[in-house]
């Protein structure tokens, strides 16, 4: 896996499968940015996403190019870019469509820590 504080870019389905499995086993929150090189909002949010990865070392950040890994995008039912999927231990917790910085940050904080039921 990439060093802490970095966004992990996967370029093959095999690489994606291997890295996602390792991330799921870590039990950390996973945030996946489904992006495209031709998408202006994707380019706008990319530095914000990279900055969040640097600030939240207890979260695993992935970047998936929908044109490179279209089967992965289809698996997650991505319809528009950017789409951010928040997952924990293989379960999708939240989906954010669009370059909505505040919504991404709010979901990051919401799902990062799970409070044990009393």
Curated annotation (Swiss-Prot):
Changing residue 42 to S: Loss of disulfide reductase activity. Residues 2-113 form the Thioredoxin domain. GO terms for molecular function: mRNA binding; oxidoreductase activity, acting on a sulfur group of donors, disulfide as acceptor. One of its GO terms (biological process) is response to microbial phytotoxin. The modification N-acetylalanine is found at residue 2. PROSITE patterns: THIOREDOXIN_1, THIOREDOXIN_2. Disruption phenotype: High sensitivity to heat shock. Disulfide bonds join 39-42. The active site is at residues 39, 42. The keyword Membrane does not apply. Changing residue 39 to S: Loss of disulfide reductase activity. Pfam families: Thioredoxin (PF00085). It is found in: Cytoplasm. Keywords: Acetylation, Chaperone, Cytoplasm, Disulfide bond, Electron transport, Redox-active center, Transport. Belongs to the thioredoxin family. Plant H-type subfamily. Interacts with FBA5 and FBA8. Interacts with FBA6. Interacts with MDH1. This is Thioredoxin H3. It comes from Arabidopsis thaliana.
């Amino acid at each position: 896996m990439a060093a802490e504080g970095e966004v992990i870019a996967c370029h093959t389905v095999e690489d994606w499968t291997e890295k996602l499995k390792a991330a799921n086993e870590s039990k950390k929150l996973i945030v996946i940015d489904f992006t495209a090189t031709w998408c202006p909002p994707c380019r706008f949010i990319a530095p914000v996403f990279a900055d969040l990865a640097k600030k939240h070392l207890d979260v695993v950040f992935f970047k998936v190019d929908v044109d490179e890994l279209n089967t992965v995008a289809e698996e997650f039912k991505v319809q528009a870019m950017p789409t951010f999927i928040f997952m924990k231990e293989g379960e999708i917790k939240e989906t954010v469509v669009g370059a909505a910085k505040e919504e991404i940050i709010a979901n990051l904080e919401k799902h990062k820590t799970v409070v044990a039921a009393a």
